[in-house]
UniProtKB/Swiss-Prot annotation:
GO terms for molecular function: small ribosomal subunit rRNA binding; structural constituent of ribosome. The lineage of its organism: Bacteria, Bacillati, Actinomycetota, Actinomycetes, Mycobacteriales. Pfam families: Ribosomal_S20p (PF01649). GO terms for cellular component: cytosol; small ribosomal subunit. The keyword Amino-acid biosynthesis does not apply. HAMAP family: Ribosomal_bS20. InterPro entries: Ribosomal_bS20 (IPR002583), Ribosomal_bS20_sf (IPR036510). One of its GO terms (biological process) is translation. This is Small ribosomal subunit protein bS20. Binds directly to 16S ribosomal RNA. Belongs to the bacterial ribosomal protein bS20 family.
Length: 86
């Protein structure tokens, strides 16, 4: 355990941020998985709906610093390509 007051606070804030980031990443994975399932089923309307929702989640995660902006862009591009293949 840290002895310095600021270190104790950093430990608390880092843990809170870790849990928050973990939650955001989990919801991202779930959104991407549900999109891929719709795309694999060939349901273009549902895939387009989920593409918008997933892109929004990716952008929010990137703006909050949970994932890198380039990673969000690459994932959005791959999802858009998957929709266009249907």
């Amino acid at each position: 355990m840290a002895n310095i007051k600021s270190q104790v606070k950093r430990i608390r804030t880092n843990e809170a941020a870790r849990l928050r980031n973990q939650s955001v990443k989990s919801s991202l994975r779930t959104a991407i998985r549900s999109f891929r399932e719709a795309a694999a089923a060939g349901d273009k309307d549902k895939a387009n709906e989920l593409l918008v929702a997933t892109s929004r989640k990716l952008d929010k995660a990137a703006s909050k610093g949970v994932i890198h902006a380039n990673q969000a862009a690459n994932k959005k591009s791959a999802l858009a390509q998957a929709v266009n293949k249907i």
